[in-house]
Amino acid sequence: MIYFEVDTEELSHAIRGLNIPKSKLNSILKTAVNRTARQAKTWLPEEAEDRYHIKRRGQVKKGLKMTGAKISSPVAHIISSGHANDLYDFNVTSRRYSPGNRPPSGHKANVLRANSPVALMLKPNAGRDKYRAFVVKYKSNHIALAQRIPGKKMEGNSKKEAIRNLYSISTPAMLGYEKGVMAKVSPKTEALLASEVAKGIERYLKL
């Protein structure tokens, strides 16, 4: 969860001489906080895309829910929901689903743009495709990266080993990573919030 608020006690002390009623000040803060939070909902997916090889930025934004500030409580919350993302949602080579023509060297993937692609193989130098990752397409038409599970048989076909999808970082973890996405978004939201509060006070004083 990401939240936005203003230190009302410190602000009240700073503007004591302006004689702004507390109810009006809280109204100014509510507007400023909500405008900042709405902008942050746009910045977060953008910064995530800059840092990660995420293929579906729209899904990241869709998973963000905002609880707006109120006059009685000028605090806004942005909540990110979602489970681990399919590794296929990030940078994968090759992305092609072709069971009869898989890449001889296997598939590679990377999640962070700063990192180089890594070969997806459970056992180094595994013969053929047995323990290499491969692109799979389910009856629902969902496409993912998967690998065989050594020693576990597939239900309904004991001659084959079972498969499991490969996952990566969840969207909440991606957005809340303090050295990554939030490290870039926080300074911008702090500056915007201060600016919006100042604009609100200026508008009031001009009445």
Protein language model annotation of sequence segments:
Residues 1-207:
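Short, Lys/Arg-rich flexible segments
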